[in-house]
Amino acid sequence: MEEEVAALVIDNGSGMCKAGFAGDDAPRAVFPSIVGRPRHHGIMIGMGQKDSYVGDEAQSKRGILTLRYPIEHGVVTNWDDMEKIWHHTFYNELRVAPEEHPILLTEAPINPKFNREKMTQIVFETFNAPAFYVSIQAVLSLYASGRTTGIVLDSGDGVTHVVPIYEGFSLPHAISRVDMAGRDLTDYLMKILAERGYTFSTTAEREIVRDIKEKLCYVALDFEQEIQTASQSSSLEKSYELPDGQVITIGNERFRAPEALFQPNVLGLESGGIHVTTFNSIMKCDVDVRKDLYGNIVMSGGTTMYPGISDRMQKEITALAPSSMKVKIIAPPERKYSVWIGGSILASLSTFQQMWISKQEYDESGPSIVHRKCF
């Protein structure tokens, strides 16, 4: 019998949910944060059709379902669906009883206060957890990279944020958040593929475009140069087979979609690119800490997985920074899951054990305790 019950670490992303046990080096379960509902009436008796499907099952039956993501831009917008996802995580993916394990959840920085309270309430009241903690995603990514100082560029499916951290303290006045991330790039790719004559419109077809994006897109080091290369030869063209067997060819769309990270104006957004956002965030910090931030720019999240993104980032930041400044981009290979890995490290530290909000504290103070205990 183990004397210590492992905590559960759940990183609820806008696109994928990563879940597992504290102390593990990778999440046990990674599945899409999707809830699907049938678009048609079930007519076969005894098929055991459900009124909703979660995760991979929703993904595989997507042809007959309407897919909804309960988390948009890192903020939970549909709590009933969110509860379904958590239920699925505990009972189907991890196969644990949530009332027996402390639970660590993650959230985006600058999240609405109500959001954390509601999360706390559901964990304690619906799932009866013995203890709970909520941690900021970017901070966990820094833990995972083994640093206490650095500036984290965390870009997932729903939200991108830049969080400077010095000696373990996040500098809240310099945190920037951009509501542009993987999902917007998928939508943009859908749009530019339509210009080529390939239309994708349903929620299921959007998932196909996401797959094209993940398999074929990359970031150009020099965008103008790349556009020229693409127009002169077909060396950059790649083909992709759709589920029905039709083969499509994509060329400059491969790097035009992720270019939106550096030029959000193509999406009609006013914010600066990720390089400008990172630079501005560093400039909001004290002059004494900037050198350490320039030298520790840590990438995390699935949207930083494009080939070529580190080199481009290095080039762009170097151009903005003072000429003598040493700029270093750290892009760990496991950065897709670095938030989860950081959570796993945090929840297994002996010094962390007094940080949990216990069920008893919750019963005494209610959901608002989360603002006092988790920061």
Swiss-Prot record:
Principal localisation: cytoplasm
EC number of the protein: 3.6.4.-
Subcellular location(s) of the protein: Cytoplasm, Cytoskeleton
Protein name per UniProt: Actin, gamma
Keywords: ATP-binding, Cytoplasm, Cytoskeleton, Hydrolase, Nucleotide-binding
SMART domains to which the protein is assigned, alphabetical: ACTIN (SM00268)
GO MF assignments: ATP binding; hydrolase activity
Any one cellular-component term (Gene Ontology): cytoplasm
Top-level taxon of origin: Eukaryota
Catalytic activity: ATP + H2O = ADP + phosphate + H(+)
Source organism phylogeny: Eukaryota, Fungi, Dikarya, Ascomycota, Pezizomycotina
Family, as annotated: Belongs to the actin family.
Keyword Cytoplasm: yes
Organism, as annotated: Penicillium chrysogenum
InterPro entries for the chain: Actin (IPR004000), Actin/actin-like_CS (IPR020902), Actin_CS (IPR004001), ATPase_NBD (IPR043129)
Functional note: Actins are highly conserved proteins that are involved in various types of cell motility and are ubiquitously expressed in all eukaryotic cells.
